[in-house]
Protein backbone atom coordinates (compact mmCIF):
# COMPACT_ATOMS: atom_id res chain seq x y z
CA UNK A 1 0.00 0.00 0.00
CA UNK A 2 1.34 3.41 -1.01
CA UNK A 3 0.55 6.16 1.47
CA UNK A 4 -0.85 9.38 0.04
CA UNK A 5 0.52 12.55 1.66
CA UNK A 6 -1.29 15.87 2.09
CA UNK A 7 1.04 18.58 3.38
CA UNK A 8 -0.68 21.52 5.09
CA UNK A 9 1.00 24.92 5.38
CA UNK A 10 -0.16 28.38 6.42
CA UNK A 11 0.60 31.89 5.24
CA UNK A 12 -0.01 35.60 5.84
CA UNK A 13 -0.71 35.30 9.59
CA UNK A 14 -0.63 32.64 12.29
CA UNK A 15 -3.68 31.11 14.01
CA UNK A 16 -5.61 30.64 10.77
CA UNK A 17 -6.86 27.24 11.89
CA UNK A 18 -4.55 24.86 10.01
CA UNK A 19 -5.19 22.19 12.65
CA UNK A 20 -8.96 22.48 12.35
CA UNK A 21 -8.77 22.48 8.54
CA UNK A 22 -6.49 19.42 8.54
CA UNK A 23 -8.70 17.59 11.04
CA UNK A 24 -11.88 18.47 9.13
CA UNK A 25 -10.44 17.20 5.85
CA UNK A 26 -9.36 14.03 7.67
CA UNK A 27 -12.89 13.61 9.04
CA UNK A 28 -14.38 13.72 5.52
CA UNK A 29 -11.80 11.29 4.11
CA UNK A 30 -12.41 8.96 7.07
CA UNK A 31 -16.15 9.17 6.36
CA UNK A 32 -15.32 7.94 2.86
CA UNK A 33 -13.83 4.78 4.36
CA UNK A 34 -10.16 5.76 4.17
CA UNK A 35 -7.64 5.06 6.95
CA UNK A 36 -6.30 8.52 7.82
CA UNK A 37 -3.70 9.80 10.24
CA UNK A 38 -2.52 13.36 10.94
CA UNK A 39 0.88 14.67 12.01
CA UNK A 40 1.96 18.02 13.42
CA UNK A 41 5.51 19.30 12.83
CA UNK A 42 6.33 22.08 15.29
CA UNK A 43 9.18 24.48 14.45
CA UNK A 44 10.09 25.50 18.00
CA UNK A 45 13.32 24.28 19.63
CA UNK A 46 11.76 22.80 22.78
CA UNK A 47 12.01 19.00 22.63
CA UNK A 48 8.29 18.80 23.39
CA UNK A 49 5.68 21.16 24.91
CA UNK A 50 5.74 19.33 28.26
CA UNK A 51 7.59 22.07 30.14
CA UNK A 52 6.24 25.06 28.20
CA UNK A 53 4.01 27.63 29.90
CA UNK A 54 0.31 26.92 29.26
CA UNK A 55 -0.33 30.68 29.00
CA UNK A 56 2.13 30.88 26.09
CA UNK A 57 1.56 27.63 24.25
CA UNK A 58 -1.84 26.40 25.41
CA UNK A 59 -2.55 22.98 26.84
CA UNK A 60 -0.28 19.96 26.57
CA UNK A 61 -2.24 17.11 24.99
CA UNK A 62 -1.28 13.65 26.24
CA UNK A 63 -1.55 10.68 23.88
CA UNK A 64 -2.38 7.09 24.81
CA UNK A 65 1.29 6.12 24.70
CA UNK A 66 2.27 8.98 27.02
CA UNK A 67 3.63 11.61 24.63
CA UNK A 68 3.28 15.26 25.67
CA UNK A 69 2.19 16.94 22.46
CA UNK A 70 0.72 20.01 20.81
CA UNK A 71 -2.94 20.82 21.47
CA UNK A 72 -3.69 20.31 17.77
CA UNK A 73 -3.44 16.56 18.36
CA UNK A 74 -6.47 16.97 20.59
CA UNK A 75 -8.35 18.42 17.62
CA UNK A 76 -7.20 15.50 15.48
CA UNK A 77 -8.54 12.91 17.95
CA UNK A 78 -11.82 14.77 18.34
CA UNK A 79 -12.37 14.75 14.57
CA UNK A 80 -11.19 11.25 13.58
CA UNK A 81 -11.19 7.79 15.16
CA UNK A 82 -7.44 7.21 14.72
CA UNK A 83 -5.58 7.51 18.03
CA UNK A 84 -2.54 9.76 18.02
CA UNK A 85 0.84 8.54 19.33
CA UNK A 86 4.29 10.04 19.90
CA UNK A 87 4.90 9.51 16.17
CA UNK A 88 2.25 12.11 15.31
CA UNK A 89 4.06 15.15 16.73
CA UNK A 90 7.68 16.24 16.77
CA UNK A 91 9.60 19.48 17.04
CA UNK A 92 12.76 21.09 15.73
CA UNK A 93 14.25 20.46 19.17
CA UNK A 94 13.48 16.74 18.97
CA UNK A 95 15.00 16.47 15.49
CA UNK A 96 18.18 18.31 16.46
CA UNK A 97 18.51 16.29 19.69
CA UNK A 98 18.30 13.03 17.72
CA UNK A 99 20.76 14.17 15.06
CA UNK A 100 23.26 15.45 17.63
CA UNK A 101 22.97 12.20 19.61
CA UNK A 102 23.82 10.25 16.45
CA UNK A 103 26.72 12.60 15.71
CA UNK A 104 28.16 12.04 19.20
CA UNK A 105 27.86 8.28 18.72
CA UNK A 106 29.76 8.54 15.46
CA UNK A 107 26.87 7.39 13.28
CA UNK A 108 27.75 9.93 10.58
CA UNK A 109 31.34 8.68 10.27
CA UNK A 110 32.89 12.12 10.65
CA UNK A 111 30.71 13.90 8.10
CA UNK A 112 29.98 17.61 8.48
CA UNK A 113 26.46 17.78 9.92
CA UNK A 114 24.25 20.20 8.00
CA UNK A 115 20.60 21.19 7.79
CA UNK A 116 20.54 19.65 4.32
CA UNK A 117 20.75 16.66 4.20
CA UNK A 118 21.00 15.54 7.84
CA UNK A 119 18.19 17.54 9.48
CA UNK A 120 15.86 17.25 6.48
CA UNK A 121 16.52 13.51 6.23
CA UNK A 122 15.66 13.09 9.91
CA UNK A 123 12.40 14.98 9.37
CA UNK A 124 11.49 12.83 6.36
CA UNK A 125 12.25 9.62 8.25
CA UNK A 126 9.89 10.63 11.06
CA UNK A 127 7.13 11.64 8.65
CA UNK A 128 7.39 8.32 6.79
CA UNK A 129 7.40 6.38 10.08
CA UNK A 130 4.31 8.25 11.30
CA UNK A 131 2.46 7.60 8.06
CA UNK A 132 3.26 3.88 7.94
CA UNK A 133 0.21 1.64 7.70
CA UNK A 134 -2.22 4.42 6.75
CA UNK A 135 -3.79 5.14 3.37
CA UNK A 136 -3.63 8.91 3.83
CA UNK A 137 -1.29 10.97 6.00
CA UNK A 138 -2.10 14.64 6.52
CA UNK A 139 1.02 16.50 7.66
CA UNK A 140 0.56 19.95 9.20
CA UNK A 141 3.62 22.20 9.34
CA UNK A 142 3.41 24.66 12.23
CA UNK A 143 4.23 28.33 11.89
CA UNK A 144 3.80 30.64 8.91
CA UNK A 145 5.50 30.44 5.53
CA UNK A 146 8.29 33.02 5.61
CA UNK A 147 9.31 32.29 9.19
CA UNK A 148 12.94 31.22 9.46
CA UNK A 149 12.05 28.49 11.98
CA UNK A 150 9.93 26.44 9.57
CA UNK A 151 12.36 26.43 6.62
CA UNK A 152 13.90 22.98 7.35
CA UNK A 153 10.41 21.44 7.55
CA UNK A 154 9.28 23.07 4.30
CA UNK A 155 12.44 21.88 2.55
CA UNK A 156 11.90 18.38 3.93
CA UNK A 157 8.30 18.13 2.67
CA UNK A 158 9.38 19.53 -0.71
CA UNK A 159 11.96 16.75 -0.98
CA UNK A 160 9.56 14.09 0.28
CA UNK A 161 6.90 15.05 -2.27
CA UNK A 162 9.46 14.69 -5.05
CA UNK A 163 10.65 11.33 -3.70
CA UNK A 164 7.20 9.72 -3.36
CA UNK A 165 5.99 11.23 -6.64
CA UNK A 166 3.47 14.00 -7.22
CA UNK A 167 0.71 11.43 -7.74
CA UNK A 168 1.21 10.48 -4.07
CA UNK A 169 1.64 13.95 -2.54
CA UNK A 170 -0.33 17.20 -2.55
CA UNK A 171 0.11 20.58 -0.88
CA UNK A 172 -2.75 22.44 0.82
CA UNK A 173 -2.01 26.05 1.79
CA UNK A 174 -4.15 28.17 4.14
CA UNK A 175 -4.12 31.93 3.67
CA UNK A 176 -6.01 34.95 4.94
CA UNK A 177 -8.32 36.83 2.56
CA UNK A 178 -9.23 39.95 4.57
CA UNK A 179 -12.34 42.05 4.03
CA UNK A 180 -11.77 45.81 3.90
CA UNK A 181 -14.92 47.63 4.99
CA UNK A 182 -13.72 50.92 3.48
CA UNK A 183 -13.38 49.30 0.06
CA UNK A 184 -16.35 46.98 0.52
CA UNK A 185 -14.46 43.98 -0.85
CA UNK A 186 -12.14 41.13 0.05
CA UNK A 187 -8.48 41.54 -0.87
CA UNK A 188 -6.53 38.75 -2.55
CA UNK A 189 -3.07 40.33 -2.59
CA UNK A 190 -1.90 38.80 0.75
CA UNK A 191 -2.75 35.35 -0.62
CA UNK A 192 -0.84 36.03 -3.85
CA UNK A 193 2.25 37.09 -1.91
CA UNK A 194 2.00 34.11 0.43
CA UNK A 195 1.91 31.70 -2.52
CA UNK A 196 4.83 33.59 -4.09
CA UNK A 197 6.79 33.02 -0.86
CA UNK A 198 5.93 29.32 -0.97
CA UNK A 199 6.98 29.09 -4.62
CA UNK A 200 10.36 30.61 -3.75
CA UNK A 201 10.91 27.59 -1.49
CA UNK A 202 10.04 25.25 -4.34
CA UNK A 203 6.49 24.34 -3.37
CA UNK A 204 3.51 24.87 -5.69
CA UNK A 205 0.30 24.53 -3.67
CA UNK A 206 -2.36 22.25 -5.15
CA UNK A 207 -5.19 23.57 -2.98
CA UNK A 208 -5.75 26.97 -1.38
CA UNK A 209 -7.96 27.26 1.69
CA UNK A 210 -8.95 30.92 1.92
CA UNK A 211 -9.87 32.04 5.42
CA UNK A 212 -12.20 34.98 5.76
CA UNK A 213 -15.02 36.29 7.91
CA UNK A 214 -17.40 35.77 4.98
CA UNK A 215 -17.85 33.59 1.91
CA UNK A 216 -15.42 34.62 -0.83
CA UNK A 217 -17.21 35.55 -4.10
CA UNK A 218 -16.64 33.35 -7.16
CA UNK A 219 -14.99 36.21 -9.06
CA UNK A 220 -12.37 36.64 -6.34
CA UNK A 221 -11.76 32.90 -6.18
CA UNK A 222 -11.21 32.91 -9.94
CA UNK A 223 -8.72 35.75 -9.53
CA UNK A 224 -6.83 33.82 -6.84
CA UNK A 225 -6.78 30.72 -9.06
CA UNK A 226 -5.36 32.71 -11.99
CA UNK A 227 -2.59 34.45 -10.05
CA UNK A 228 -1.65 31.44 -7.89
CA UNK A 229 -1.67 28.80 -10.63
CA UNK A 230 -4.28 26.46 -9.14
CA UNK A 231 -7.60 25.24 -10.60
CA UNK A 232 -10.67 27.27 -9.61
CA UNK A 233 -12.26 24.24 -7.93
CA UNK A 234 -9.15 24.00 -5.72
CA UNK A 235 -9.69 27.49 -4.26
CA UNK A 236 -11.80 26.79 -1.19
CA UNK A 237 -13.64 29.43 0.81
CA UNK A 238 -13.48 28.72 4.54
CA UNK A 239 -15.52 31.40 6.26
CA UNK A 240 -15.87 31.90 10.01
CA UNK A 241 -18.51 29.65 11.58
CA UNK A 242 -20.00 29.52 15.07
CA UNK A 243 -18.90 25.92 15.59
CA UNK A 244 -15.73 24.17 14.44
CA UNK A 245 -17.78 20.99 13.97
CA UNK A 246 -19.46 22.62 10.96
CA UNK A 247 -16.16 22.77 9.04
CA UNK A 248 -16.26 19.19 7.62
CA UNK A 249 -19.64 19.88 5.98
CA UNK A 250 -18.41 23.29 4.76
CA UNK A 251 -15.39 21.73 3.04
CA UNK A 252 -17.41 18.82 1.64
CA UNK A 253 -19.96 21.23 0.15
CA UNK A 254 -17.11 22.55 -2.02
CA UNK A 255 -16.02 19.00 -2.99
CA UNK A 256 -12.59 19.30 -1.41
CA UNK A 257 -12.53 15.59 -0.56
CA UNK A 258 -13.40 14.61 -4.14
CA UNK A 259 -10.60 16.80 -5.48
CA UNK A 260 -8.06 14.92 -3.37
CA UNK A 261 -9.42 11.44 -4.07
CA UNK A 262 -9.54 12.12 -7.82
CA UNK A 263 -5.98 13.48 -7.87
CA UNK A 264 -4.76 10.48 -5.88
CA UNK A 265 -6.76 7.99 -7.93
CA UNK A 266 -8.50 6.63 -4.84
CA UNK A 267 -11.75 4.76 -5.33
CA UNK A 268 -13.94 5.09 -2.26
CA UNK A 269 -17.54 5.60 -1.23
CA UNK A 270 -19.19 8.99 -0.79
CA UNK A 271 -18.70 10.60 2.60
CA UNK A 272 -21.47 10.01 5.12
CA UNK A 273 -21.45 12.93 7.56
CA UNK A 274 -24.59 11.87 9.44
CA UNK A 275 -22.70 11.71 12.75
CA UNK A 276 -21.47 15.28 12.28
CA UNK A 277 -24.96 16.44 11.30
CA UNK A 278 -26.20 14.97 14.59
CA UNK A 279 -23.48 16.84 16.52
CA UNK A 280 -24.46 20.12 14.84
CA UNK A 281 -28.15 19.48 15.56
CA UNK A 282 -27.50 18.74 19.24
CA UNK A 283 -25.31 21.83 19.51
CA UNK A 284 -27.97 24.07 17.95
CA UNK A 285 -30.93 22.72 19.93
CA UNK A 286 -30.20 22.64 23.67
CA UNK A 287 -33.11 22.45 26.12
CA UNK A 288 -31.47 24.75 28.69
CA UNK A 289 -28.19 26.45 29.61
CA UNK A 290 -26.00 25.72 32.63
CA UNK A 291 -23.13 27.85 33.93
CA UNK A 292 -20.04 25.97 35.03
CA UNK A 293 -17.25 27.76 36.84
CA UNK A 294 -13.75 26.68 35.84
CA UNK A 295 -11.39 27.63 38.65
CA UNK A 296 -7.82 27.66 37.33
CA UNK A 297 -4.57 29.59 37.25
CA UNK A 298 -4.11 29.80 33.46
CA UNK A 299 -7.51 31.36 32.68
CA UNK A 300 -5.93 34.32 30.86
CA UNK A 301 -5.57 31.93 27.89
CA UNK A 302 -8.60 29.63 27.53
CA UNK A 303 -6.57 27.40 25.17
CA UNK A 304 -4.64 26.31 28.27
CA UNK A 305 -7.74 24.24 29.02
CA UNK A 306 -8.71 23.47 25.41
CA UNK A 307 -9.63 19.81 25.89
CA UNK A 308 -11.56 20.56 29.10
CA UNK A 309 -13.52 23.29 27.30
CA UNK A 310 -14.39 20.92 24.48
CA UNK A 311 -15.21 18.02 26.83
CA UNK A 312 -17.68 20.22 28.72
CA UNK A 313 -19.35 21.09 25.42
CA UNK A 314 -19.47 17.39 24.53
CA UNK A 315 -21.08 16.70 27.90
CA UNK A 316 -23.66 19.32 26.98
CA UNK A 317 -24.30 17.65 23.62
CA UNK A 318 -25.03 14.33 25.31
CA UNK A 319 -27.43 15.93 27.82
CA UNK A 320 -28.94 18.53 25.44
CA UNK A 321 -27.64 21.36 27.61
CA UNK A 322 -25.73 24.42 26.47
CA UNK A 323 -22.65 24.91 28.66
CA UNK A 324 -21.57 28.43 29.54
CA UNK A 325 -18.05 28.29 30.96
CA UNK A 326 -17.19 31.02 33.45
CA UNK A 327 -13.43 31.30 33.94
CA UNK A 328 -12.38 32.20 37.47
CA UNK A 329 -8.77 32.88 38.43
CA UNK A 330 -8.07 30.94 41.61
CA UNK A 331 -5.90 33.80 42.88
CA UNK A 332 -8.93 36.09 42.72
CA UNK A 333 -10.75 33.75 45.09
CA UNK A 334 -7.83 34.07 47.51
CA UNK A 335 -8.07 37.87 47.50
CA UNK A 336 -11.79 38.48 46.98
CA UNK A 337 -13.38 35.43 48.57
CA UNK A 338 -15.73 32.62 47.60
CA UNK A 339 -18.54 35.00 46.59
CA UNK A 340 -17.00 34.78 43.10
CA UNK A 341 -18.48 31.27 43.00
CA UNK A 342 -22.06 32.36 43.65
CA UNK A 343 -24.64 31.70 40.95
CA UNK A 344 -22.82 28.73 39.41
CA UNK A 345 -24.53 25.45 38.55
CA UNK A 346 -21.31 23.43 38.95
CA UNK A 347 -17.62 23.91 39.71
CA UNK A 348 -14.68 22.33 37.88
CA UNK A 349 -11.07 22.56 39.07
CA UNK A 350 -8.69 21.42 36.29
CA UNK A 351 -5.05 20.35 36.46
CA UNK A 352 -2.09 22.64 37.05
CA UNK A 353 1.40 22.90 38.50
CA UNK A 354 3.00 25.09 41.16
CA UNK A 355 1.81 26.73 44.36
CA UNK A 356 0.34 29.91 42.86
CA UNK A 357 -3.43 29.95 43.27
CA UNK A 358 -3.67 26.60 45.08
CA UNK A 359 -5.43 28.00 48.17
CA UNK A 360 -8.09 29.50 45.88
CA UNK A 361 -8.69 26.08 44.37
CA UNK A 362 -8.96 24.57 47.85
CA UNK A 363 -11.57 27.21 48.71
CA UNK A 364 -13.49 26.33 45.53
CA UNK A 365 -13.58 22.65 46.53
CA UNK A 366 -14.77 23.62 50.01
CA UNK A 367 -17.50 25.87 48.61
CA UNK A 368 -18.75 23.08 46.32
CA UNK A 369 -18.74 20.53 49.14
CA UNK A 370 -20.48 22.72 51.71
CA UNK A 371 -23.09 24.09 49.30
CA UNK A 372 -23.82 20.73 47.62
CA UNK A 373 -22.82 22.11 44.21
CA UNK A 374 -21.70 19.51 41.63
CA UNK A 375 -17.89 19.33 41.64
CA UNK A 376 -15.48 17.75 39.19
CA UNK A 377 -11.79 17.78 40.06
CA UNK A 378 -9.16 16.82 37.50
CA UNK A 379 -5.57 15.94 38.50
CA UNK A 380 -4.64 18.82 40.84
CA UNK A 381 -8.40 19.33 41.17
CA UNK A 382 -8.58 15.95 42.91
CA UNK A 383 -5.59 16.72 45.10
CA UNK A 384 -7.02 20.03 46.35
CA UNK A 385 -10.34 18.30 47.09
CA UNK A 386 -8.42 15.75 49.15
CA UNK A 387 -6.51 18.49 51.01
CA UNK A 388 -9.70 20.45 51.70
CA UNK A 389 -11.54 17.41 53.05
CA UNK A 390 -8.59 16.41 55.22
CA UNK A 391 -8.32 19.91 56.70
CA UNK A 392 -11.99 20.72 57.25
CA UNK A 393 -13.71 17.36 57.76
CA UNK A 394 -11.11 14.79 58.82
CA UNK A 395 -9.58 17.10 61.44
CA UNK A 396 -6.11 17.10 59.88
CA UNK A 397 -5.14 20.73 60.49
CA UNK A 398 -2.32 21.91 58.25
CA UNK A 399 -2.89 19.17 55.66
CA UNK A 400 -1.26 19.96 52.31
CA UNK A 401 0.70 18.53 49.41
CA UNK A 402 4.45 18.03 49.71
CA UNK A 403 4.66 19.70 46.28
CA UNK A 404 3.78 23.00 47.95
CA UNK A 405 4.83 22.50 51.58
CA UNK A 406 7.40 19.81 52.26
CA UNK A 407 7.22 19.97 56.07
CA UNK A 408 3.43 20.11 56.48
CA UNK A 409 1.78 18.26 59.37
CA UNK A 410 -0.30 16.00 57.12
CA UNK A 411 1.16 15.48 53.62
CA UNK A 412 -1.99 13.99 52.11
CA UNK A 413 -0.43 14.31 48.65
CA UNK A 414 3.17 13.34 47.90
CA UNK A 415 5.63 12.57 45.11
CA UNK A 416 5.13 9.22 43.39
CA UNK A 417 8.47 7.46 43.71
CA UNK A 418 7.42 4.17 42.15
CA UNK A 419 4.55 2.84 40.08
CA UNK A 420 3.74 0.01 37.69
CA UNK A 421 2.95 1.07 34.14
CA UNK A 422 0.33 -0.54 31.92
CA UNK A 423 2.86 -3.07 30.58
CA UNK A 424 3.88 -4.19 34.07
CA UNK A 425 7.19 -2.30 34.14
CA UNK A 426 8.23 -0.56 37.36
CA UNK A 427 8.88 3.18 36.93
CA UNK A 428 10.86 5.08 39.57
CA UNK A 429 11.37 8.82 40.16
CA UNK A 430 13.03 11.10 42.70
CA UNK A 431 12.80 14.82 43.41
CA UNK A 432 16.04 15.24 41.43
CA UNK A 433 14.54 13.76 38.25
CA UNK A 434 14.26 16.10 35.24
CA UNK A 435 10.92 17.89 34.85
CA UNK A 436 10.54 16.99 31.18
CA UNK A 437 9.11 13.58 30.30
CA UNK A 438 9.38 12.13 33.81
CA UNK A 439 5.76 12.15 34.96
CA UNK A 440 3.31 9.28 35.11
CA UNK A 441 2.09 9.65 31.55
CA UNK A 442 -0.33 8.04 29.15
CA UNK A 443 -3.18 5.59 29.30
CA UNK A 444 -3.41 3.55 32.51
CA UNK A 445 -5.83 0.90 33.74
CA UNK A 446 -8.19 1.91 36.56
CA UNK A 447 -10.39 -0.39 38.67
CA UNK A 448 -13.78 1.08 39.62
CA UNK A 449 -15.44 0.22 42.93
CA UNK A 450 -18.82 -1.49 42.63
CA UNK A 451 -21.74 0.69 43.71
CA UNK A 452 -19.88 3.96 43.07
CA UNK A 453 -21.12 6.85 40.91
CA UNK A 454 -18.25 6.40 38.48
CA UNK A 455 -18.93 2.66 38.08
CA UNK A 456 -22.53 3.53 37.24
CA UNK A 457 -21.53 6.27 34.78
CA UNK A 458 -18.87 4.25 32.96
CA UNK A 459 -20.90 1.02 33.09
CA UNK A 460 -17.72 -1.04 33.39
CA UNK A 461 -15.55 -2.44 36.22
CA UNK A 462 -12.34 -1.22 34.53
CA UNK A 463 -11.45 1.77 32.37
CA UNK A 464 -8.40 3.24 30.66
CA UNK A 465 -7.68 6.95 31.12
CA UNK A 466 -4.69 9.19 30.43
CA UNK A 467 -2.44 10.60 33.13
CA UNK A 468 0.00 13.47 33.50
CA UNK A 469 1.20 13.92 37.07
CA UNK A 470 4.06 13.26 39.46
CA UNK A 471 2.17 13.62 42.77
CA UNK A 472 -0.37 11.23 44.27
CA UNK A 473 -2.53 10.69 47.35
CA UNK A 474 -0.56 9.50 50.40
CA UNK A 475 -2.01 6.07 51.19
CA UNK A 476 -0.77 6.20 54.81
CA UNK A 477 -3.28 8.94 55.63
CA UNK A 478 -6.20 7.43 53.71
CA UNK A 479 -7.82 5.50 56.60
CA UNK A 480 -8.41 8.68 58.63
CA UNK A 481 -9.79 10.53 55.59
CA UNK A 482 -12.08 7.69 54.52
CA UNK A 483 -13.34 7.30 58.08
CA UNK A 484 -14.55 10.91 57.84
CA UNK A 485 -16.75 10.14 54.81
CA UNK A 486 -14.70 10.48 51.63
CA UNK A 487 -14.43 7.31 49.54
CA UNK A 488 -11.83 6.06 47.08
CA UNK A 489 -13.77 4.66 44.12
CA UNK A 490 -11.01 4.18 41.54
CA UNK A 491 -7.62 2.47 41.92
CA UNK A 492 -4.61 1.94 39.65
CA UNK A 493 -3.80 -1.37 37.93
CA UNK A 494 -1.83 -2.60 40.97
CA UNK A 495 -4.47 -1.05 43.27
CA UNK A 496 -1.81 1.01 45.05
CA UNK A 497 -2.57 4.48 43.67
CA UNK A 498 -5.76 6.48 44.20
CA UNK A 499 -7.36 7.37 40.85
CA UNK A 500 -10.88 8.57 41.79
CA UNK A 501 -12.54 9.90 44.93
CA UNK A 502 -16.20 10.61 45.73
CA UNK A 503 -18.17 12.03 48.65
CA UNK A 504 -21.20 9.70 48.95
CA UNK A 505 -23.38 12.11 50.96
CA UNK A 506 -22.94 14.86 48.33
CA UNK A 507 -25.28 14.95 45.27
CA UNK A 508 -22.33 14.88 42.85
CA UNK A 509 -18.75 15.28 44.08
CA UNK A 510 -16.27 13.36 41.93
CA UNK A 511 -12.56 13.96 41.38
CA UNK A 512 -10.06 12.01 39.28
CA UNK A 513 -6.28 11.91 39.19
CA UNK A 514 -6.36 11.25 35.45
CA UNK A 515 -7.40 13.60 32.61
CA UNK A 516 -10.75 12.43 31.19
CA UNK A 517 -10.87 15.42 28.84
CA UNK A 518 -8.25 13.83 26.57
CA UNK A 519 -10.60 11.01 25.53
CA UNK A 520 -13.80 13.02 25.08
CA UNK A 521 -15.08 13.48 21.52
CA UNK A 522 -18.09 15.34 20.08
CA UNK A 523 -19.58 12.19 18.61
CA UNK A 524 -19.16 9.93 21.66
CA UNK A 525 -18.80 12.36 24.57
CA UNK A 526 -17.35 11.10 27.86
CA UNK A 527 -19.10 9.44 30.79
CA UNK A 528 -17.67 11.76 33.47
CA UNK A 529 -18.40 14.99 31.62
CA UNK A 530 -21.89 13.87 30.60
CA UNK A 531 -22.59 12.96 34.23
CA UNK A 532 -21.14 16.24 35.48
CA UNK A 533 -23.14 18.44 33.08
CA UNK A 534 -26.29 16.44 33.83
CA UNK A 535 -25.70 17.03 37.56
CA UNK A 536 -25.32 20.77 36.86
CA UNK A 537 -28.70 20.75 35.11
CA UNK A 538 -30.34 18.92 38.02
CA UNK A 539 -28.79 21.36 40.52
CA UNK A 540 -30.17 24.27 38.49
CA UNK A 541 -33.66 22.72 38.46
CA UNK A 542 -33.59 22.20 42.25
CA UNK A 543 -32.61 25.83 42.75
CA UNK A 544 -35.36 27.09 40.44
CA UNK A 545 -37.94 25.11 42.39
Curated annotation (Swiss-Prot):
Mg(2+) binds at residues 72, 140. CTP binds at residues 14, 147-149, 187-192, 223. Keywords: ATP-binding, Glutamine amidotransferase, Ligase, Magnesium, Metal-binding, Nucleotide-binding, Pyrimidine biosynthesis. The active site is at residues 379, 515, 517. Allosterically activated by GTP, when glutamine is the substrate; GTP has no effect on the reaction when ammonia is the substrate. The allosteric effector GTP functions by stabilizing the protein conformation that binds the tetrahedral intermediate(s) formed during glutamine hydrolysis. Inhibited by the product CTP, via allosteric rather than competitive inhibition. L-glutamine binds at residues 352, 380-383, 403, 470. Residues 1-266 are annotated as: Amidoligase domain. It holds the Pfam family CTP_synth_N. Pathway: Pyrimidine metabolism; CTP biosynthesis via de novo pathway; CTP from UDP: step 2/2. One of its GO terms (molecular function) is identical protein binding. GO terms for biological process: 'de novo' CTP biosynthetic process; pyrimidine nucleobase biosynthetic process. InterPro entries: Class_I_gatase-like, CTP_synthase, CTP_synthase_N, GATASE, GATase1_CTP_Synthase, P-loop_NTPase. CTPSs have evolved a hybrid strategy for distinguishing between UTP and CTP. The overlapping regions of the product feedback inhibitory and substrate sites recognize a common feature in both compounds, the triphosphate moiety. To differentiate isosteric substrate and product pyrimidine rings, an additional pocket far from the expected kinase/ligase catalytic site, specifically recognizes the cytosine and ribose portions of the product inhibitor. Catalyzes the ATP-dependent amination of UTP to CTP with either L-glutamine or ammonia as the source of nitrogen. Regulates intracellular CTP levels through interactions with the four ribonucleotide triphosphates. Belongs to the CTP synthase family. This is CTP synthase. The gene is pyrG.
Amino acid sequence: MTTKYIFVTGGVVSSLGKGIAAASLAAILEARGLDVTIMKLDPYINVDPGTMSPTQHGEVFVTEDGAETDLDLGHYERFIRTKMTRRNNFTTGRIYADVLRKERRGDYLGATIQVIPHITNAIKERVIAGAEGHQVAIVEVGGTVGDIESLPFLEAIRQLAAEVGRNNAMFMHLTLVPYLAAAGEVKTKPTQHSVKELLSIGIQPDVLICRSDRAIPAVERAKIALFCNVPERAVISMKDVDSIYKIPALLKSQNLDSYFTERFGLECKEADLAEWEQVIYEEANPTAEVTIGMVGKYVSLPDAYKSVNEALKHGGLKTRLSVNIKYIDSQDIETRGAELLEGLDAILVPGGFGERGVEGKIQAAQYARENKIPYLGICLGMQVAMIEFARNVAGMEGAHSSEFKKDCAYPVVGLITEWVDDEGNIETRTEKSDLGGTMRLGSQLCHLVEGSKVRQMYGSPTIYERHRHRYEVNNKLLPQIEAAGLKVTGLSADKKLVEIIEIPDHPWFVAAQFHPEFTSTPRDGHALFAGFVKAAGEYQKRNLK
